[in-house]
Amino acid sequence: KITETGSVWWNIMDSYNTRTQIRSNAAEALLAMQGKESRSWKNYKFKRYSAGHAYLKDGEQCMIPQRIAERAARMGYYLKSIISWCKTASMPEPQQSRVSRNVEYILHLTIQRTPYFDKKSYLSLSPELGGKQSFESEKLSDFWHLPTSAGGEGHGAQFPVQLPGRCIALTSRENDIVLDPFVGSGTAAAVAAVLKRRYIGFDICDKYLQTAEKKINKATNK
């Protein structure tokens, strides 16, 4: 259960209402984005169709972050910010009718109007852990210009260290508990440990849990 002064950070990328295959994991989706997926449309058991949708036209942007934010607000959460994370690099998109996506969104949700928020940590935290980058303004805004992850650990959707580091530093104190319900390669948990927070992480994939444990041990010199 989230504490009264706690925060929820939710990173999500928008999508388009297009016909697509439903892939089983992030690594499989990454191969497809890189053009290395050899299966054809008919070989997929699960598929998403874009025609006949109740409120989205074929090829239209879905506005997923905004819809989640609206629903969360109706459930009683406070939507504090929708932050734009402008990545230094992104996957190419073979689209000729629109611009390519280079922004992901981070929803900051709380259960009360005035959560714990340490704005000074933006300037005091090391840039390697999510503090102010050399090309960012002195003012902490809702536009974050942070690098993408170099990857290399078998997970197709890794965070850069700076992203969870900034979120954790802004909205928690030392010894607080950080929960990551999709721990993946363990980046958020490792950063939480470095910042002297306790952490809980779980994932549906045992392979990722093993990777996460190794990353946490390395970060804490165990």
Where do the language-model regions lie?
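Core catalytic lobe of class I
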Residues: 1-211, 217-221
